[in-house]
């Protein structure tokens, strides 16, 4: 008897001798049958030993590796029986169950495997169920069919977060009804998950017959409420489901509801296009089958297409019910006069004036213009329009202006004037135009636009006195504007009321600082032929004191003095102009007037003053003119001196100045004077280059782009430029 047998005999209840015995025969030449006999003795002796059974089951399962489960079914069945025997006493061991299930999944025994899964779930504690269910799910995925559905249902009880995966798996297997139920459960739990809704709706759309609780119609209707921005696509899905189920009338009802309740043009377009396509398919089918209903369906399709612009208008009006523009677009769709009138009536009744988006007055005006040929009705509409409490006075003014213009165009100018006059009459003249607490009707008499139109109207159809009274009323209401000032002054001038005209100009100057200069200009032009010199001088001095830099005032003042024969006074005015407005243009004007009145020689003081006062660029230009003037007078030395003096203002890059000087020396100079010119030009060139260099360096330093100091040793030989020979500044090369 071997030592192992002796150990077992001496310790019959101890598992360790059996383990040692089994381990010793694993790799020796003992046959599989002998090993099996040993395992049988061991598990018979110790039937509750997990280790012995695990070793035995691993050994027997391993013997089946590579064997065809159909050809060697008997061998597999013996191992199955062995697993069953082990589980009699070891039914609480999850590893044995899992190993058994894995072994069964190798065999074509679907019913047996399902039975073992159920037994495992019944035997093991709940905490171990997920392990079994994961393996069961692999089995269900492999075999598919109702088995997979049932396993999935049990699996998601343990793993509820896997319901979406379950739905995907069921869809792949073709169990649309079960998948839809799972998706509905997910939606009820998760709320507004649009991805799940899309998946559910697509699933419904792909299924011809689908019975759900709640019904499909209720499900999609719920989706429309939850996702209003997807109303169009969801409506189309519902209609298509009904079409596939043969319920065409219900599908039409869904389409009709979709196009009449859509809140966006996008949703409307989606539903309408699907609706039209649906009707076209029906018409095509009826025509192909020569159905007598074809003509009726064609007529209904045509009517649907004709309704499209009106339905789109409905959509826009549902979104913007108070939009004046959208109502105008709606009205423009109608061709029948009765329908147009009904649309206008609906529009003005639907838009509360306080909430109007846009000018409500334009709607009333266009309605009145619709009745342009029926004066009585048009005026009635205009009258009603004046009673509407608009948001702004401007809108009410638009109505009165349109009404008055309508009457004027129809040669009823008395009514045209009367309409505006009545609008501008108010017992309370002290209200503020901008007081929004008052109605537009209470403030309309402060409308500048209406008063302006009224003044033009009275001036065209009334008398001078009536027009004057209008302007006086405007002034009394503190509604005067610069334009009113000009218009009123022009009216007074045309009727020879000059003193009153001057008073109007003076009032305008005192009221409007921003426009005072323009009013002064008009005032002085109009006053010059009509007032005495002393009074005019006072006016000009007053204007110039307020606008000392306005060149036009000096020119106008100087012209007055010249026209009155007081040329020297005019020159003093022009001199003052150049003191306050230092530009080349003012000096040139002064020079021009001096030449005309006193000759060329008299301009020397003016030129001198210009060269002292003007910036370099302008001084250079005037210096050139000055030198050429002296040349004309034969003053060659003076001209040369001026050229030299003006060179300090003139950059040599300005070719015009030095070219003129060059020609002058060629014509009148000597070799010495020419050399002097070149020396001066070179000196000025150096001066300008130095100025440019310093300006550039300063700019680079400010920007931080100047290169830092570099040691001499670091300069590479190839970067050293040859030295420049020192030039003699006094050496001049002549190129004559």
UniProtKB/Swiss-Prot annotation:
GO cellular component term of the entry, any: U2-type catalytic step 2 spliceosome
Compartments (UniProt record): Nucleus
InterPro entries per UniProt: HAT (IPR003107), HAT_Syf1-like_N (IPR055433), HAT_Syf1_central (IPR056350), HAT_Syf1_CNRKL1_C (IPR055430), Syf1-like (IPR045075), TPR-like_helical_dom_sf (IPR011990)
Main localization, broad class: nucleus
Keyword Nucleus: yes
Gene Ontology process terms (BP): generation of catalytic spliceosome for first transesterification step; mRNA splicing, via spliceosome
A matching Pfam family: HAT_Syf1_CNRKL1_N
Coiled-coil residues: none
HAT repeats mapped onto the chain: 1-27, 30-62, 74-106, 130-161, 246-281, 339-373, 377-409, 428-460, 462-494, 496-529, 531-563, 598-632, 634-667
Record keywords: mRNA processing, mRNA splicing, Nucleus, Repeat, Spliceosome
Role summary: Involved in pre-mRNA splicing and cell cycle progression.
Protein family according to the UniProt entry: Belongs to the crooked-neck family.
Subunit structure of this chain's protein: Associated with the spliceosome.
Protein name, per record: Pre-mRNA-splicing factor SYF1
Taxonomic lineage: Eukaryota, Fungi, Dikarya, Ascomycota, Saccharomycotina
